Curated annotation (Swiss-Prot):
ATP binds at Q87, G105, E106, G107, K108, T109, D512. The lineage of its organism: Bacteria, Pseudomonadati, Pseudomonadota, Gammaproteobacteria, Enterobacterales. The keyword Transferase does not apply. The gene is secA. Its cofactor is Zn(2+). It catalyses: ATP + H2O + cellular proteinSide 1 = ADP + phosphate + cellular proteinSide 2. One of its GO terms (cellular component) is plasma membrane. This is Protein translocase subunit SecA. Belongs to the SecA family.
Amino acid sequence: MLIKLLTKVFGSRNDRTLRRMRKVVNIINAMEPEMEKLSDEELKGKTAEFRARLEKGEVLENLIPEAFAVVREASKRVFGMRHFDVQLLGGMVLNERCIAEMRTGEGKTLTATLPAYLNALTGKGVHVVTVNDYLAQRDAENNRPLFEFLGLTVGINLPGMPAPAKREAYAADITYGTNNEYGFDYLRDNMAFSPEERVQRKLHYALVDEVDSILIDEARTPLIISGPAEDSSEMYKRVNKIIPHLIRQEKEDSETFQGEGHFSVDEKSRQVNLTERGLVLIEELLVKEGIMDEGESLYSPANIMLMHHVTAALRAHALFTRDVDYIVKDGEVIIVDEHTGRTMQGRRWSDGLHQAVEAKEGVQIQNENQTLASITFQNYFRLYEKLAGMTGTADTEAFEFSSIYKLDTVVVPTNRPMIRKDLPDLVYMTEAEKIQAIIEDIKERTAKGQPVLVGTISIEKSELVSNELTKAGIKHNVLNAKFHANEAAIVAQAGYPAAVTIATNMAGRGTDIVLGGSWQAEVAALENPTVEQIEKIKADWQVRHDAVLEAGGLHIIGTERHESRRIDNQLRGRSGRQGDAGSSRFYLSMEDALMRIFASDRVSGMMRKLGMKPGEAIEHPWVTKAIANAQRKVESRNFDIRKQLLEYDDVANDQRRAIYSQRNELLDVSDVSETINSIREDVFKATIDAYIPPQSLEEMWDIPGLQERLKNDFDLDLPIAEWLDKEPELHEETLRERILAQSIEVYQRKEEVVGAEMMRHFEKGVMLQTLDSLWKEHLAAMDYLRQGIHLRGYAQKDPKQEYKRESFSMFAAMLESLKYEVISTLSKVQVRMPEEVEELEQQRRMEAERLAQMQQLSHQDDDSAAAAALAAQTGERKVGRNDPCPCGSGKKYKQCHGRLQ
């Protein structure tokens, strides 16, 4: 009560921010007549003038009024569009490292030109981040004339572009691209073998469009580049045959997992657990199939991988539904994004889940992948010096933006008042009753010429509504993951009188729905239209536009509440753009997923008390409140998951930054001989200490063991025993010095053969390859540690602290291994002629190019939240790293010729 009173007196923080910024808007407006007097050349010359002022030490913020006034005037001349005052406010919010909440249709794309221009003046580059390639290309091409008029360069960063084209795109003043592509380029740059292979500059300013989708919805999905691991597709097929014999348990006794069924499903956490009966049955079936030996337990250490296959197969059958979570197209399982309803070509679930779904659907099973490099969006975007974003719905997630990204949210007012009518929810007992009510509402609305947009949460639901509309004889368009090639065109015409469009979630986001349809799309469909044709199309559109406004504007129907209020608000936000008329209503049933999981008992009890009859709906503030509470529960749970993922990833992030920093230093120097000499001393000291403990008696020395170790690991055949026999006075310290001196001498002889320059080149290559190899193994070890660390909680230990402690120990051990393996490899390698070294380098480059061409980046999403992976196939290897080396040495390939690949 007191807070509300204070807010009334002093205004909210949002009000105070906007009040401060409106003073600057007044200054910009006062400059408008002065800007109008400038010629095109004088206006273009302002960019060079601003840059000169910045070089002399002027602060960027001081340029805001004049720079924004220049962009507004340039926009008037190039596009014939003038930035509204609210767009100037939005531009200032975005420059202040904030999230700007701007309603749909308020011109976010044009608003973004203001801070993009201002921050591009520094010459450090601006990255405009969009949710898909179509929007990146559209926005770049639409805004290119404006930026080029002002003397700035524009680049587009798309998947599959060759490195030189990417480098050129990143060198531009303003670069447009998707969040995935920026993240993957960062990871690829940190896997490069020479400075020339890198494409990104230092990360300066990121302007994220649809920021809620990228920084929140996708925050649980780490970007991962991975290569193929061993083939286990046959095992997935064999285990898949067993699963249909298991029966799902309806009521789970979480304490004992006892009951009639064989497995229980927890829909909240998206997990499946075997019951005791299920464990007995599955062990019998595994023995019968010859997969497991009689008398063995599925939980024994020897069967860990088998348990992994069983769990993945159970989840595939019990939790993942065709045409809801994925579709099958051209013999491939393609994931459907739960947030947008779009298909995500190439994206793959991790932990063997995708392979299990492929086995379930009977399509070809692709190999599992091994992580080569990874980063979460949370940690990638925090690498930028300056981060800002815009969306139509951010206020509900303001706390998360603030706590994780340190970004304040500012709600920017609309240019015209919002007059859309948001009608109360209607709740029915069954889904069939709900669908029937939706059909009746659509009939009523279209009869008076009102366009309707129906939002569904899955392809399955969109097809269900579509079938019912077809039966009722209502013409409609379906926009879902199966047919989104012409997405923008369908969305653009969704405002046509009496048009009915069914869209999964927020498919088509980024394209405005214009009342009366898009006259521009009609003009674009004609070949060489005349002025008369264009005028007629415009006149026809105006008649349609007025008719739709008269009918009540665009009506939004939500067929279910989403887990997040923000997604519901996004659907509603498609109507009522720029002060247009509109309305919205959500239809719910007690069979909806959200109601069933979170609100069913309380609300259904309430409905029974009210004596509900079939076909009747309940419309009451209590019900609306119960639904809002259910959504808050889910949002809170999802926030906790994302926060927990970040806390764990922060540990890996510190290590990642250390490794990538070290790696970049290595790439940028040509001579690492000093580092090698320092490492050699450390390695030989540690090796000798293991056999000749410091300050120990000679009887405690293991000379045969030391000789064997030096021979096997460093190719040093030293007669240490003879030295000690011939020189009894030879003490420990002198012996250490002699062994080290011998190793240096042998190494110098190698250097004389190939030349110092070649040896420096080779040393650098070995260090980089060894670092990459060990880092890859370390990532896998960290992943295993992360998966089981929660069990430490049963021993009254804090899993996060345990994870930090153990991962640090593993990291320290990896650095020691790095030193040892670098010196071991350099000591054992036999190089005879400079030509051989050159040939080796040529082979490595050709192989790197081949792998780069074969690389298919794919983004995975795992509902279990903590670990998902974005896989990049990097080609098949003929010899596995742990296979015997083909040279016949008897050693593992990775410890022999694999070093030189």
